[in-house]
Amino acid sequence: MSNLSTNYVMTLLQNYRTSKRKIEQLRYELEHPARVTPDEMIEAMNFAKGDGEGRPSGSVSNKTLYIAMNFQSAADEANAALTHDLVSRLVPLEQEINRLEHYVALLEPRQTEVIRLAYFEGHTWQQISAKTQTTTRTLYKIRNQAVEELAEMYALTADLQR
């Protein structure tokens, strides 16, 4: 298998935990957006003090309402743009991680275990060695075989997409 494919797979594996964290951050931002509601903005502008040009405080001019309505529209557009940006970053990242997880699940059980422990759960090679009662040298061989097989899977789908 080409070095390009194996390097790509190794990069995916090494960045797995960071990518999962980014996915969770983006999901949180989508579910709990920091937004100012149009009603809050209109209310704040509605009771704002004037510039002292003879209007009693608290009165609303047509100009103020026009500005508030424009702000409402601008706020809606900004919120929509933010949501679109979050989704456009989240979807490809989720697809990449889901694909990697699926391909890892297709490996032999021993390979899957080593990849999961090392890259998905972040254990050290010494911890994995103790847990699996396997030498680190053997673990590296298993990892290398798994990376080769993953690279073949990615190469196959790359050929199909052409």
Model-found features: residue ranges?
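Short amphipathic alpha helix immediately N-terminal
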Residues: L106-H123
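N-terminal interaction/assembly modules
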Residues: M1-Y103, A155-R162
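C-terminal flanking helix
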Residues: V147-Y154
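Helix-turn-helix DNA-binding module
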Residues: E121-T138
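Juxtamembrane/interface motifs at transmembrane-helix termini
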Residues: T134-R137, E149, L160-Q161
